[in-house]
């Protein structure tokens, strides 16, 4: 697995010195992600170099840099760890508590009046607490990023990252919750026991197939939004990218043939949303026959990688297998989304060189574009659940903000505002609120 490695190199400030370092990096077969000048002093420049490096990569790189007459390997940067030190989130008061009167109002004895008001009318919890701005981010650590089953504690930095993004992008409070259980019954029971503290539930990094059962059961018993982000957040951004790509090519997404390679949580969520969107022919490939049965129940067709590459206009891959798609199987005009992180099934540049009309990987097609606005909009509408209409509205909003790219900048707060507004509008429609029929569960 390739994980960004950050090294510090001191280079003489003269022509060609840095180029020699970069040549060594290229000869080692490493990809340069980022290059930053840290400081210059006494004729030397200190450079921070971010590389894509395998965990078992040849560490001769450092010795080769040291061997250059104009450069010196200083060490590795702790930038990533420094940004995590002490955690990435905290709870703060919305207003100063700096007088005894304020203290008595927000805590004892004044808070008792608010407690009694909520006891008399439970709906007032929405007026006098932060519940409508609070999301539980829950994991059991069985499918953390591309790292797999590493345990809930090791996944806490991911959950904190989600919470930080909620706060930064849509001003929601995300609360990471780690569950030390793999059993679906225990997961559901625990979440049901604590759900009153939260306006919505985000399920994160639960392994398939248990993730499907857990989400379905929670949706059946909780009258609040529940979303497994690995399924539906990824599906929303994928749909947005496909809307953008097909519009630019003058094609209809709904009459295109789509192949989904890999039918875990993300792949299954993508198939389900594409079918809900109205895509007529969706093929799916996976080694697990139960996964094939699951998508066939949605109206998709079981298939193989070879058939998908040969017949489909659009190919999506979420297998976690590096270089799974042979470049020679790419057909001119195909749209290729190889979404596995940190390493894709095929490099987008390679796919484009083989004739793909559009190609992207998981670095750009990222669910951070979807989940903040999805939850902000659902909470603002007091929606009892997420519906297909809400997910599709989010995808359309993302596509509308794409500009010259397949998807917009995930740090553009206007994107998240647009997504939230679209989701809230969709949630308020009668069918979404359960007033005119029951929408297909997500």
Annotated model-derived regions:
Residues 225, 229, 338-340, 345-437:
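Adenosine-phosphate binding glycine-rich loop
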Residues 145, 152-170, 222, 228, ...:
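Glycine-rich phosphate/diphosphate-binding loop of Rossmann-like nucleotide-binding domains
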Residues 1, 40-41, 83, 125-131, ...:
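Solvent-exposed alpha-helices and their adjacent loops that cap or buttress functional pockets
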Residues 93-126:
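An N-cap/entry alpha-helix motif that binds or orients negatively charged groups
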Residues 298-359, 364:
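Rossmann-like adenosine-cofactor binding region
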Residues 138-139, 146-147, 153-160, 184-233:
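Phosphate/diphosphate ligand-binding glycine-rich loop within oxidoreductases
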Residues 1-85:
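A conserved regulatory-domain signal marking ACT and ACT-like small-molecule sensing domains
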């Amino acid at each position: 697995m390739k994980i960004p490695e950050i090294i510090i190199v001191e280079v003489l400030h003269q022509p060609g010195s840095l180029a020699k370092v970069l040549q060594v990096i290229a000869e080692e077969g490493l990809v340069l992600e980022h290059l930053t000048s840290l400081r210059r002093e006494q004729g030397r420049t200190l450079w921070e170099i971010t590389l894509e490096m395998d965990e078992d990569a040849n560490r001769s790189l450092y010795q080769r840099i040291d061997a250059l007459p104009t450069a010196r390997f200083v060490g590795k940067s702790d930038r990533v760890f420094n940004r995590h030190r002490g955690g990435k989130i905290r709870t703060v008061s919305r207003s100063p508590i700096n007088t005894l009167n304020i203290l008595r109002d927000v805590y004892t004895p004044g808070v008792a009046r608010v407690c009694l008001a909520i006891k008399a009318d439970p709906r007032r919890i929405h007026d006098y607490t932060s519940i409508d701005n609070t999301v539980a981010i829950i994991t059991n650590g069985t499918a953390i990023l591309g790292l797999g089953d590493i345990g809930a504690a090791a996944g806490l930095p991911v959950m904190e990252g989600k919470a930080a993004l909620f706060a930064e992008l849509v001003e929601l409070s995300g609360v990471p919750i780690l569950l030390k259980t793999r059993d679906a019954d225990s997961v559901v029971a625990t979440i049901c026991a604590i759900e009153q503290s939260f306006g919505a539930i985000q399920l994160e990094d639960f392994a398939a197939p248990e993730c499907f059962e857990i989400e379905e059961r929670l949706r059946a018993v909780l009258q609040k939004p529940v979303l497994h982000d690995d399924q539906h957040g990824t599906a929303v951004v994928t749909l947005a990218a496909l809307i953008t790509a097909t519009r630019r090519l003058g094609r209809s997404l709904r009459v295109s043939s789509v192949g989904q390679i890999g039918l875990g949580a993300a792949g299954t969520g993508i198939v389900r949303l594409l079918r809900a969107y109205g895509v007529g022919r969706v093929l799916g490939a996976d080694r697990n026959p139960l996964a094939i049965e699951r998508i066939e129940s949605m109206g998709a067709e079981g298939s193989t990688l070879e058939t998908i590459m040969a017949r489909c206009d659009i190919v999506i891959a979420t297998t976690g297998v590096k270089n799974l798609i042979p470049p020679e199987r790419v057909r001119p005009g195909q749209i290729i989304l190889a979404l596995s992180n940190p390493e894709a099934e095929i490099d987008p540049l390679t796919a484009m060189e083989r004739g793909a009309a559009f190609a992207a990987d998981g670095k750009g097609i990222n669910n951070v574009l979807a989940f903040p606005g999805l939850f902000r909009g659902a909470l603002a509408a007091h929606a009892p659940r997420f519906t297909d209409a809400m997910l599709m509205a989010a995808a359309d909003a993302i596509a509308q903000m794409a500009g010259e790219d397949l998807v917009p900048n995930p740090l553009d707060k206007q994107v998240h505002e647009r997504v939230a507004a679209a989701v809230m509008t969709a949630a308020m429609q009668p069918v979404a609120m359960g007033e005119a029929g029951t929408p297909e569960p997500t």
